[in-house]
């Protein structure tokens, strides 16, 4: 425990919070261009081919972004919007692609949780 005199000489240092999504630079989303679209395998014990893409953002960062939902239309040079949110079983993937924004289409035939996958309300 520090004495009053010690605290007068050198106050307590505040802990600096470290961002989980540094490339967003405190913005809710960022726009970027796909430089590579590919699949990768998750950590043990999971098994799949997860769809991801490398994205060059407008601020110069290059990050890996997960493409959620079944099927996508992304290819190299597609302009997409990314948001924060990591994928627990893919090391190094700390961003999600926003479906239904810019060049990324919504998920086809999606009926539930539509707002998360950029799908309009079906007609009747």
UniProtKB/Swiss-Prot annotation:
Positions of modified residues (N6-acetyllysine): 108
UniProt xrefs under InterPro entries: NA-bd_OB-fold, Ribosomal_uS12, Ribosomal_uS12_bac
Task of the protein: With S4 and S5 plays an important role in translational accuracy. Interacts with and stabilizes bases of the 16S rRNA that are involved in tRNA selection in the A site and with the mRNA backbone. Located at the interface of the 30S and 50S subunits, it traverses the body of the 30S subunit contacting proteins on the other side and probably holding the rRNA structure together. The combined cluster of proteins S8, S12 and S17 appears to hold together the shoulder and platform of the 30S subunit.
PROSITE patterns: RIBOSOMAL_S12
Self-association and partners: Part of the 30S ribosomal subunit. Contacts proteins S8 and S17. Interacts with ArfA. May interact with IF1 in the 30S initiation complex.
Keyword Acetylation recorded: yes
HAMAP family recorded: Ribosomal_uS12_B
Originating gene: rpsL
Modification sites for 3-methylthioaspartic acid: 89
PANTHER family for this protein: 30S RIBOSOMAL PROTEIN S12 FAMILY MEMBER
Additional remark text: At least 19 substitutions or deletions in 11 codons can promote streptomycin resistance, dependence or pseudodependence; all but one of the streptomycin resistant mutations (K42R) are associated with hyperaccurate translation and thus reduced translational efficiency.
Stated consequence of mutating residue 57 to H: Protein is not incorporated into ribosomes
Key words, A-Z: Acetylation, Antibiotic resistance, Methylation, Ribonucleoprotein, Ribosomal protein, RNA-binding, rRNA-binding, tRNA-binding
Protein name: Small ribosomal subunit protein uS12
GO terms, biological process: cytoplasmic translation; Group I intron splicing; maintenance of translational fidelity; positive regulation of RNA splicing; response to antibiotic; RNA folding; translation
Similarity remark: Belongs to the universal ribosomal protein uS12 family.
Gene Ontology MF term list: misfolded RNA binding; rRNA binding; structural constituent of ribosome; tRNA binding
A Pfam family recorded for this sequence: Ribosom_S12_S23
Gene Ontology cellular component annotations, sorted alphabetically: cytoplasm; cytosol; cytosolic small ribosomal subunit; ribosome
């Amino acid at each position: 425990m520090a004495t009053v005199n010690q605290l007068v000489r050198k106050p307590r240092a505040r802990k600096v919070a470290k961002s989980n999504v540094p490339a967003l630079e405190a913005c809710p989303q960022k726009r970027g261009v796909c430089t590579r679209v590919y699949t990768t395998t998750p950590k043990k014990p999971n098994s799949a081919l997860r769809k991801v893409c490398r994205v060059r953002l407008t601020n110069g960062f290059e990050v890996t972004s997960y493409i959620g939902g079944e099927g996508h239309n992304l290819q190299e040079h597609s302009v997409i919007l990314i948001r924060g949110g990591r994928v627990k079983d893919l090391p190094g993937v700390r961003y999600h692609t926003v479906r239904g924004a810019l060049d990324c289409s919504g998920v086809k035939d999606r009926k539930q949780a539509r707002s998360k996958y950029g799908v309009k309300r079906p007609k009747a």
